[in-house]
């Protein structure tokens, strides 16, 4: 048994892989002196997915990394060989995780069933190889496209926690002490009624199993009708696997543990018949405060009157705690197995189209003048510069033709350019000549 940090809200960065670049290769084969273009397309970038895993109860494992980046697509190759697609990243999150966009707050997904999958970052599409650019006027195109960048965003993951174990019992029977002993929860503990005013949630790890324990506060006689605080908090345990009912077996406060049990049991039945039918164990706390003879008498009476399995313990000394935790883990594991089989959504990972943007051949050009320097800019100027490989002869030529077609010369003259001034295009400098 180990204690697990409880984390229910995190921010992560996700990015799809970049598409691979297309190839600008040519056939080089014996007896084929003028082999044509044979450059293959780049592979698509990998995607990032979130998947609801019923075996997780906290976002701790996800929070250990801040960035999740899928693999880039492989570049295209000769012989019309496509590059390999980048590997996806699949992030397991607990069932009940709500996914929001960090910037807008928009809810992207509510992963409320085991096995649900959502794509949160698409990979970029691979660039085209030079086989796509062959034409009657360009028989040997030395041009290819660069792959498109993958989608990137920041996400907020929030966990709507569903308790696996609901702790019930009168105030001061030791619920808060018990949950702090077995988990990471650290409730304020004092000896007066209604000490706990919000549900304390703790995460316990037993071997590979994580489960959530909720300490339901203020549950007293009349709670189902709104007395105390119980009516508000009973909802937190409606979907739990097991009710752990803690009683003060010592009776030090003058109450009868058997009567206490039936009082609380009655409230559960009034609130929800479904809740009342859940598996239940009774934890008889404060065994260190009475003699062994008196303890045996009281335990026997409790067993006989309730017909339930009784687990004697002293939360203060720790006696009997481990046995209780392993019993709870056994019940939760069986319940999870049943619910997972009945509720699981066997979703195949659906891959939307990779990220890609068709660029128009007609667009606006802007000129920024800084002394004798004239910087050519504009949204599509930048995007075409990224799309085409300007180190390739025909790629550079196509880029300059696009600029000329969209009035580069006219724009420069309107900006007051003179012979000998410097023109900057895509981080390259040229001397302007009339």
From Swiss-Prot:
GTP binds at residues 169-176, 194-198, 215-218, 285-288, 314-316. Gene3D superfamilies: GTP-binding protein OBG, C-terminal domain, GTP1/OBG domain, P-loop containing nucleotide triphosphate hydrolases. Its cofactor is Mg(2+). Its EC number is 3.6.5.-. Residues 163-333 form the OBG-type G domain. Belongs to the TRAFAC class OBG-HflX-like GTPase superfamily. OBG GTPase family. This is GTPase Obg. It comes from Thermosipho africanus (strain TCF52B).
């Amino acid at each position: 048994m180990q204690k697990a940090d409880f984390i229910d809200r995190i921010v992560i960065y996700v990015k799809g892989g970049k598409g691979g670049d297309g190839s600008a290769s040519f056939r080089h084969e014996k007896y084929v002196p003028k082999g044509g273009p044979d450059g293959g397309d780049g592979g698509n970038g990998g995607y990032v997915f979130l998947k609801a895993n019923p075996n997780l109860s906290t976002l701790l494992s996800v929070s250990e990394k801040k960035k999740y980046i899928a693999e880039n697509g492989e570049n295209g190759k000769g012989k019309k060989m496509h590059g390999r697609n980048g590997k996806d990243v699949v992030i397991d999150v607990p069932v009940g995780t709500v996914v929001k966009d960090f910037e807008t707050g928009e809810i992207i997904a509510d992963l409320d069933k085991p096995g649900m999958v959502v794509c949160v970052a698409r990979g970029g599409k691979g660039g085209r190889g030079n086989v796509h650019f062959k034409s009657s006027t360009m028989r040997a195109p030395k041009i290819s496209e660069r792959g498109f960048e993958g989608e990137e965003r920041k996400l907020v993951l929030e966990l709507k926690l569903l308790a696996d174990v609901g702790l019930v019992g009168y105030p001061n029977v030791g619920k808060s002490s018990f949950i702090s002993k077995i988990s990471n929860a650290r409730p304020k503990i004092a000896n007066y009624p209604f000490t706990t005013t919000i549900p304390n949630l703790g995460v316990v790890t037993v071997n590979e199993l994580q489960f959530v324990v909720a300490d339901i506060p203020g549950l007293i006689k009349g709670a189902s009708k709104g007395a105390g605080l119980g009516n508000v908090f009973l909802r937190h345990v409606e979907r739990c696997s097991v009710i752990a009912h803690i009683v003060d077996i010592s009776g030090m406060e003058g109450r009868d543990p058997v009567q206490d049990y039936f009082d609380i049991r009655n409230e559960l039945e009034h609130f929800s018949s479904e809740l009342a039918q859940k598996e239940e164990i009774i934890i008889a706390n404060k065994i260190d405060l009475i003699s062994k003879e008196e303890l045996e008498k009281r335990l026997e009476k409790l067993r006989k009157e309730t017909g339930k399995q009784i687990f004697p313990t002293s939360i203060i000394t720790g006696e009997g705690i481990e046995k209780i935790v392993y019993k709870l883990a056994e019940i939760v594991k069986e319940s999870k197995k049943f619910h997972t089989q009945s509720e699981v959504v066997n979703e195949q990972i659906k891959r939307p189209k990779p990220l890609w943007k068709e660029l128009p051949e007609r667009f606006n050009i802007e000129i920024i003048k800084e002394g004798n320097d004239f910087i050519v800019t504009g949204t599509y100027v930048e995007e075409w510069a990224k799309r085409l490989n300007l180190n390739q002869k025909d790629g550079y030529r196509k880029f300059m033709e696009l600029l000329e077609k969209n009035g580069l010369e006219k724009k420069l003259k309107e900006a007051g350019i003179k012979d000998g001034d410097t023109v900057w295009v895509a981080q390259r400098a040229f001397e302007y000549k009339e």
